[in-house]
């Protein structure tokens, strides 16, 4: 049986420990660039994934990420930003990670193989949900088991893996192969494989946000501001889209409890429509 690509030795890794620091870093950077390029052939399934994600949210169902290890970290990085970026209710975004989301200071690698943990975590999954199952190897037991449960429940599945001919790709409704090169540090999929996964996840969730109408001209118009930085960003968005000044933007956002989308299309005079007065709800 051939060794999976994610476990193979990188062609430039021989003698790595004998090189100067700058040479080591150049090889590491080059491997990251090559990993990023591997996302391009997957544009079509990534777009289908974005539509499936948007459909789940529109229909009131959940978007769920399921992964383990380094892939679990990529899932968290993307999933935790969905609500603050696009204003999607947190009740519709769930992250299932082998070992849980608490006490992450201690690695729990043994949980990747736990079918029991997967079965227990999958209890939140319902028909109509969209579940993204990812693993660099494509065969990690935790996300594979969750995907099998999804199929029985009628949830839509998106499988992401860095190796071809793997369980996640074979069993998913929308398979996304990211064929990254072997890692410079063999098997350390937090490197190239993780980079490609992050790019693919970011692309899908961002495209989903656009499909949901939460992005206008590159601005996150469904942003819910809850800190100084985000309040300032919200003001800039309202000012950029409308003819109002900062004071008007601030007052409007105050009335909408920080909701940009609530204010811009309905209550603020849009550029090019001078006869549409600024009013309060």
What would you call each of these model-derived segments?
Residues 1-38:
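Cofactor-/ligand-binding subdomain signature composed of acidic, glycine-rich
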Residues 35-44, 133-140:
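Short, glycine-rich nucleotide/cofactor-binding loops
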Residues 27-35, 94-105, 216, 243, ...:
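Gly-rich Lys/Arg/Thr-decorated short loops/hinges at beta-loop-alpha junctions or inter-strand turns
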Residues 63-199, 205-214:
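Glycine-rich phosphate-binding loops that contact phosphosugars or nucleotide phosphates
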Residues 208-281:
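Short, amphipathic alpha-helical interaction segments embedded in low-complexity terminal/linker regions
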Residues 41-56:
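A short, well-structured juxtamembrane/interface segment
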Residues 56-57, 150:
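A generic structural signal for well-ordered alpha-helical segments
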């Amino acid at each position: 049986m051939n060794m999976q690509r994610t476990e193979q030795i990188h062609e430039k890794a021989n003698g790595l420990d004998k090189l100067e620091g700058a040479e080591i870093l150049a090889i590491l950077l080059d491997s990251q660039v090559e990993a990023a390029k591997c996302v391009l052939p997957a544009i079509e399934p990534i777009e289908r994934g974005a539509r499936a994600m948007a459909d789940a949210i529109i229909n009131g169902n959940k978007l769920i990420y399921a992964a383990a290890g380094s892939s679990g970290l990529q899932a968290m990085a993307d999933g935790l930003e969905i609500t603050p970026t696009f204003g999607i209710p947190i009740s519709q975004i769930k992250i299932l990670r082998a070992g849980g989301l608490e006490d992450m200071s201690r690695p729990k690698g043994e949980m990747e193989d736990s079918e029991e943990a997967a079965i227990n975590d999958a209890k939140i999954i319902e028909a109509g949900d969209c579940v993204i199952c990812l693993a660099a190897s494509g065969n990690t037991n935790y996300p594979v088991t969750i995907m099998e449960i999804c199929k029985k429940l009628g949830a839509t599945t998106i499988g992401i893996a860095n190796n071809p001919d793997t369980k996640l790709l074979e069993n998913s409704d929308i398979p996304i192969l990211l064929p990254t090169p072997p890692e410079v540090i063999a098997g350390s999929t937090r490197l190239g494989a993780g980079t490609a996964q992050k790019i693919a996840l970011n692309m899908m969730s961002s495209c989903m946000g656009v499909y949901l109408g939460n992005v206008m001209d590159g601005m996150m118009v469904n942003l819910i501001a809850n800190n100084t930085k985000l309040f300032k960003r919200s003001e800039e968005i309202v000012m950029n889209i409308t003819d109002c000044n900062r004071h008007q933007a601030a007052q409007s956002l105050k009335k909408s409890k920080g909701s940009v989308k609530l204010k811009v299309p309905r209550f603020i005079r849009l550029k090019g429509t001078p006869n549409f007065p600024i009013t309060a709800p």
